[in-house]
Structures are given as structure tokens and as C-alpha cells.
């Protein structure tokens, strides 16, 4: 009986140790899973939501009105070609930080990077404020971006803005913003265009021409002399 009494504490200790190990393992698995999910929805360069993260946000907003501003940096390719990809990355990081700061106090607002230099702002709002949202983008980018090495670069952006109603299909909303964006770029860039069905639907046929002009026309990002 005495031997049994001595073994009980040891068995209990082993059981407790096993339980602690199991709990720690579960917690570690949860941390890894959370990090994996975060990596799936976050753009690694800018820290913004990525396309998957944006899709999740728009799915949550399906029953609410919201505004979208689709942003494309004018002449961004020239930044990479002239100053290198490190400079291009620095521009993207700074632009992302400024746009995030501009919406920092807006409840539920999200800034996401779709890829390349294309960024989208989503702002839940009971009243249509797409134009105001687009103007905020222009204001946020007014000051020059300082590149590695100290060179200052003035970055301009074209913005396509659209106000979505509750129940609107998110893919159609983004398409509308895209059409407005290309109208802004076709008009010279550096400006905001709000979606207008009468004006933007014909752009579908003109879009290849607009793309050709973007590739062959003058650069729209202005900075110091190369």
C-alpha cells in the first residue's frame, strides 16, 4: 500500500505533464494556423490586405452600402525602370502607409493591394461618398515621396470611385470602379473619376486603345531629373 501511495504522485505528475504538453501543442498549432491565415490575406510588401483579404471584407459588406476608390499610380513602370525596383517598392510602401493613415479613423475602412501598383480603398458608409474618398487619395499623395538615397519623387494617381448599395455584387462594383479608373487615366491621369454608367460602359470597347496609349504615351510620374 505504501508503494502504491508513492506511485500515485508520480503518475499524476506524468498525467499533468502530458496535459500541459497537449495544451501547449494545441496553442502552438493555433498560432501557426492564425499566422498562415494572416499570410494568406496580407500583402507581404505593404502590410495591406491582399486580394483574398479584400474578398473577405466585401463578403462581410454584402448587406451594407459602401464606397470604393480604385487607385492606380500613373507611370509607375517608369519608377522601376529609372530608379530600380527597390525604389518602386519604397513608393508602394509609402503610398500604402499614407492611404492607411488617411482612413485610420474611419470605422471599418480597409485598404488593400490588388497587385502591382493597384490599390483599393473600401469604406462602409450610409451615404455615397465615393468622390470624397477619391479626393482623399489625391490629398494623401500630394507630398513627394522620398526614395532611398534622398531623392524626392512626386507621385500621381488615377482614381476610379463608385458607391455601392446594399446587396450589390462586389465583382460588379470593382468592375465599375475599374471602368471609372480607366476614364480618369484616359483623361490624363492624376484625377478622380466617379462611375457613370452612360460614360463608362462605352469604355469597355475603348479599353485596349487606352492601354496602348498608356504604354506608348509620356510618363505621368514626375520627379527630379534622372
Predicted segments, located by residue:
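Signal-transducing coiled-coil linker helices
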Residues: 1-44, 52-65
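Active-site-flanking beta-strand signature of metal-NTP-handling nucleotidyl enzymes
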Residues: 67-73, 111
